């Protein structure tokens, strides 16, 4: 793989909120760029900013950190997590947005195969976390074992390859423990919505 360089993307919103600055990698795996699913999610957050003030949130498999950074900019206390090789980019992006987020972000490793989500969270956020079959069971176990008040999952439909099969398996197997409640498209930002991207909440089965 060629050596990667970084470039900044400025994300603006349709209101009075400040812009986010997010660095991406020119050569990367799935974690080094901002996917459309992440853009759709953060514009949804910024459309309804008040509910996030003071909330305790953890983002799984954050990649660039954009989801957690957006929530911290809206007043949430956020733990942004990923594997060790992804933390440098996340930390760079956290620092680039420090004036908006203050000290409301912690960045740390969370290995789905051996770590657990901390107790007492208001929300767990997972944006496009399902790409590989090997991660499905650990992710489902991780989510089922956590006591967060809300679990939000975002997924852009993949139509080929391992990512397609992994998504199908995840949403089938997660039904053992949760049902998926979709956010209606009318509630999303009208400029940032797509039929092949879902934003939903996992509601625990009773």
Curated annotation (Swiss-Prot):
Its EC number is 2.1.1.-. S-adenosyl-L-methionine binds at residues 35, 61-63, 82, 112. Pfam families: Methyltransf_16. Keywords: Methyltransferase, S-adenosyl-L-methionine, Transferase. One of its GO terms (biological process) is methylation. InterPro entries: Methyltransf_16 (IPR019410), SAM-dependent_MTases_sf (IPR029063). GO terms for molecular function: protein methyltransferase activity. It is an enzyme of class 2 (transferase). Transmembrane segments: none annotated. The keyword Transport does not apply. Protein-lysine N-methyltransferase. Belongs to the methyltransferase superfamily. METTL21 family. This is Protein-lysine methyltransferase vkmt-1. It comes from Caenorhabditis elegans. The gene is vkmt-1.
């Amino acid at each position: 793989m060629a050596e990667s360089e970084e470039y900044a993307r400025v994300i603006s919103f349709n209101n009075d909120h400040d812009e986010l600055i997010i660095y991406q990698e020119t050569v990367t795996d799935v974690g080094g760029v901002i996917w459309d699913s992440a853009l759709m999610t953060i514009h949804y957050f910024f459309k309804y900013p008040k509910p996030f003030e003071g909330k305790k949130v953890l983002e799984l498999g954050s990649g660039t950190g954009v989801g957690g950074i957006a929530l911290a900019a809206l007043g949430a206390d956020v733990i942004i997590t990923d594997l060790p090789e992804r933390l440098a980019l996340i930390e760079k992006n956290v620092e680039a947005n420090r004036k908006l987020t203050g000290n409301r972000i912690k960045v740390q490793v969370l290995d789905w195969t051996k770590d657990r989500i901390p107790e007492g969270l208001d929300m767990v956020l997972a944006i496009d976390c399902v790409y590989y079959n090997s991660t499905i069971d650990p992710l489902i176990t991780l989510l089922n074992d956590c006591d967060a008040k809300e679990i939000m999952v975002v997924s852009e439909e993949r139509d080929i390859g391992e990512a397609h099969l992994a998504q199908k398996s995840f949403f089938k197997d997660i039904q053992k423990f949760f049902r998926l409640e979709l956010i209606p498209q009318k509630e999303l930002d009208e400029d940032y919505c797509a039929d092949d991207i879902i934003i939903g909440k996992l509601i625990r089965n009773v």
